[in-house]
Amino acid sequence: MHYLALFFAGAFLCNSLPHLAAGLRGEPFPSPFAKPPGEGDSSPLVNFFWGLFNLLAGGYIVSTHPLVFGINPDFLTVLAGVVFLGGWISVHFGRVRSRKGGK
């Protein structure tokens, strides 16, 4: 259970980045609350709060499962969550953007 929690911490922390960045830049960006979910654009404010939620969720998990940076199973598990979700959402949002006419 410990490693599953750390994997999700990495996924939450990774997912916070594009949403916080879009929200803070004042740009719309797809979110789970858009229509259709994950493809339509949500407002910058929605993205800011969704990114903040992900940041807090990932931070909470890491705070309850202390993490030492370095080559160790805990850190590599968090990194696996970052790599898995980062790879998946980069491909997903690349497809979404190309369907919208690229940018």
Functional labels for PLM-detected ranges:
Residues 1-103:
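Membrane-interface extramembranous regions
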